């Protein structure tokens, strides 16, 4: 035996790695690339990992992924896709209040259980009214009541099959001439459970199931398409009415109170106060205003990067905190204003403080890959907000274009001059609305096509689950418990270690992630 080898038992295991407290109390500002998590013991499969996380004090998601309120990232299409895959999207506010509220309404109407406020027409309405409703709402399975309003007697229903082959000159016909009459409809009585109603809908093979009371008055309706969505997207984020969850961004100015009212009417579940520096009297006053006027509406404050900033917003009553300043791929706040903080340090410091008050943290910015998501969650964040990682997906706003044979979509920071020129809301976010000379805190660029959210997000989910498996944790709750107890260990990486951890030593390679 070589003289340096020692024989004996395996009971001795040296202390290895650093605790999170040791890692982040060294005085250096760290980014996600500056450290690694040391692996643990595996006794379960990756698909057993539970990714359930708190977005706010009262909203829980099955997937810890959130899309950023940027005008090149999140409108209704993105918010719907994120909610269906278990996360949530925040509609940007670099637009008119009416446009933003309508985007929220599209999300809330996309999937429902009992629809208690459907589009309703009367027998004397015309075929062209159905086509207008279809263009406005995206569907045409419309119940017909004697007065054209909910709560009145059901007399029929109009579906696409009734109008598909009508000629232009027939668009002035009355609906009573072509609708499916009441006696031919399958209906369910008021008081039926959602499960029972879905079973009736399945057996009937109809597209819509009207719910009527003893007087045959319409009280609700259920759609077959929603039943199929419920089957296809088991992780979907929904409210108590079985509608998809949706968030929206607002500012902290007086005119944002009007925007807030429209969003509340549209059914928004949570608002994020969109500011690059959230520790301001303006945001504190807005938090108090919202909590007083809409006590059940969840409010996310931010952005913050220190415990001192977080304290003021927690005292004001926020339900969650958004953490990050200058770490986004299109953000130049740190470069231009010399303010901010490396993102990993910011997430750990704020999360460690906010957890004492039961306030979840959203890690916002600096996410370049699935490993960064796993690190943010391991440092105490409950969810991760993504901008560039979701930009250029099919569901992101904007049109694709080609450059040098590569398919791209535009992506810009909300602090870029490009975004500020589009709408005043971007200037408000950076306190620049009154400035004669605008100081850009972001840039405009382009991002390569990533395909659909419905393929990309499942890849992210699987990556997080495999990361938790390597750590030896069956849930994100366990990951954070291990981190705070000191059981989870970290290690700093030198620049050479970072090179070693990436692809190296190859003449050429193709990097396919999924």
From Swiss-Prot:
Keywords: Acetylation, CBS domain, Cytoplasm, GMP biosynthesis, Isopeptide bond, Metal-binding, NAD, Nucleus, Oxidoreductase, Phosphoprotein, Potassium, Purine biosynthesis, Repeat, Ubl conjugation. It comes from Rattus norvegicus (Rat). Residues 114-173, 179-237 form the CBS domain. It catalyses: IMP + NAD(+) + H2O = XMP + NADH + H(+). There is a cross-link at residues 195, 208, 438 (Glycyl lysine isopeptide (Lys-Gly) (interchain with G-Cter in SUMO2)). This is Inosine-5'-monophosphate dehydrogenase 2. Homotetramer. Interacts with CLOCK; in a circadian manner. Interacts with ANKRD9; leading to its ubiquitination and degradation by the proteasome. GO terms for biological process: 'de novo' XMP biosynthetic process; cellular response to interleukin-4; circadian rhythm; GMP biosynthetic process; GTP biosynthetic process; lymphocyte proliferation; purine nucleotide biosynthetic process; retina development in camera-type eye. The modification Phosphoserine is found at residues 122, 160, 416. HAMAP family: IMPDH (MF_01964). GO terms for molecular function: identical protein binding; IMP dehydrogenase activity; metal ion binding; nucleotide binding. It is found in: Cytoplasm; Nucleus; Cytoplasm, Cytosol. The keyword Ion transport does not apply. NAD(+) binds at residues 274-276, 324-326. IMP binds at residues 329, 364-366, 387-388, 411-415, 441. Mycophenolic acid (MPA) is a non-competitive inhibitor that prevents formation of the closed enzyme conformation by binding to the same site as the amobile flap. In contrast, mizoribine monophosphate (MZP) is a competitive inhibitor that induces the closed conformation. MPA is a potent inhibitor of mammalian IMPDHs but a poor inhibitor of the bacterial enzymes. MZP is a more potent inhibitor of bacterial IMPDH. K(+) binds at residues 326, 328, 331, 500-502. The modification Phosphotyrosine is found at residue 400. Its EC number is 1.1.1.205.
């Amino acid at each position: 035996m070589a003289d340096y080898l020692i024989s004996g038992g395996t009971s001795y295991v040296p202390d290895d790695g650093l605790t999170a407290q040791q890692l982040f109390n060294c005085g250096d500002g760290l980014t996600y690339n500056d450290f690694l998590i040391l692996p643990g013991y595996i006794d379960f499969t990756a698909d057993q990992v539970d990714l359930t996380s708190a977005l706010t004090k009262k909203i829980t998601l099955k997937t810890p992924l959130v899309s950023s309120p940027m005008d090149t990232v999140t409108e209704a299409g993105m918010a719907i896709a994120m909610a269906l895959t278990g996360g949530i999207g925040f509609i940007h506010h670099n637009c008119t209040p009416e446009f933003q509220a309508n985007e929220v309404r599209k999300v809330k109407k996309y999937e429902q259980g009992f629809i208690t406020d459907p589009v309703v027409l009367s027998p004397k309405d015309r075929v062209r009214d159905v086509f207008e409703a279809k263009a406005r709402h995206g569907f045409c399975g419309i119940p017909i009541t004697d007065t054209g309003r909910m709560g009145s007697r059901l007399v029929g229903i109009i579906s696409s099959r009734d109008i598909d082959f009508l000629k232009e000159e027939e668009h002035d016909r009355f609906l009573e001439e072509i609708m499916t009459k009441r006696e031919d409809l399958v209906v369910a009585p008021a008081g039926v459970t959602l499960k029972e109603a879905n079973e009736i809908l399945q057996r009937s093979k109809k597209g819509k199931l009207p719910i009527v009371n003893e007087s045959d008055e319409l009280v609700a309706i259920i759609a077959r398409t929603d039943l199929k969505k419920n089957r296809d997207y088991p992780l979907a984020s929904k409210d108590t009415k079985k509608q998809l969850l949706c968030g929206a961004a607002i500012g902290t100015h007086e005119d944002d109170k009007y925007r807030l009212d429209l969003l509340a009417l549209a059914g928004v579940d949570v608002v994020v106060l969109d500011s690059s520096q959230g520790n301001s009297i303006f945001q504190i006053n807005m938090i108090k205003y919202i909590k007083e006027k809409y006590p059940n509406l969840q409010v996310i404050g931010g952005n913050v990067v220190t415990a001192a900033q977080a304290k003021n917003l927690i005292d004001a009553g926020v339900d969650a905190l958004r953490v990050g300043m200058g770490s986004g791929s299109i953000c130049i706040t740190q470069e231009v204003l010399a303010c901010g903080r490396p993102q990993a340090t910011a997430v750990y410091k704020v999360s460690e403080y906010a957890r004492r008050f039961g306030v979840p943290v959203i890690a916002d910015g600096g996410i370049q890959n699935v490993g960064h998501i796993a690190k943010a969650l391991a440092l105490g964040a409950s969810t991760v907000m993504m901008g560039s990682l979701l930009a250029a997906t099919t569901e992101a706003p904007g049109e694709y274009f080609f450059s040098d044979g590569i398919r791209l979509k535009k992506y810009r920071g909300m602090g870029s001059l490009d975004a500020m020129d589009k709408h005043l809301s971007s200037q408000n976010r950076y306190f620049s609305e009154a400035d004669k000379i605008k100081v850009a805190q972001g840039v405009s660029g382009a991002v390569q096509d990533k395909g659909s959210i419905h393929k990309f997000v499942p890849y992210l989910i699987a990556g997080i689950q495999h990361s938790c498996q390597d750590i030896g944790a069956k849930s994100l709750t366990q990951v954070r418990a291990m981190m705070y107890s000191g059981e989870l260990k970290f290690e700093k990486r030198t620049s050479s270690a970072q090179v070693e951890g990436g692809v190296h030593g190859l003449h050429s390679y193709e990097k396919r992630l999924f």
